[in-house]
Amino acid sequence: IRALDASSAAKISGDVVLNADKFAMDASSVAKIYVSVKAQSCAVAASSASKINASVEAVSCSVEASSASKITLKGSAAKCTADLSSASKLSAGDFVAAECSVNTSSAAKAVVNCTERLHADASSGSSIRYSGDCRTSINKSSGGSVGRN
């Protein structure tokens, strides 16, 4: 298995760790995914009030969330990128990334844990909270906020 795709209130859950070089999961339209993944690269996408709860061990992890969706991650990655919009949420306080780049807009909220370098860009009433001893590059506009947990 290299990908999971759930839509229209579907639910996918697994008790075993899924191993792949590249892994992708996509949830939309109130769907739910609960999974554990070990991969070189992992792509996580959620939209339209869907939920993803994943344990991820990866070299790189990309996250996209929109339209009131919620992604919860635990595990680790050397590099993580996250783009969130439209009241979506990323809860990744238990997901440790060495390098992290986070962009939020339109009331989206992100919580991340970064150990080396963080680039945070928050706009339009969105927020980014971070933990970890990392160097930061922060941009805020139109009521966006960035702060340490």
Question: Can you describe what each PLM-predicted range is?
Answer:
Residues 1-149:
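Extended, compositionally simple hydrophobic/Ser/Thr-rich segments
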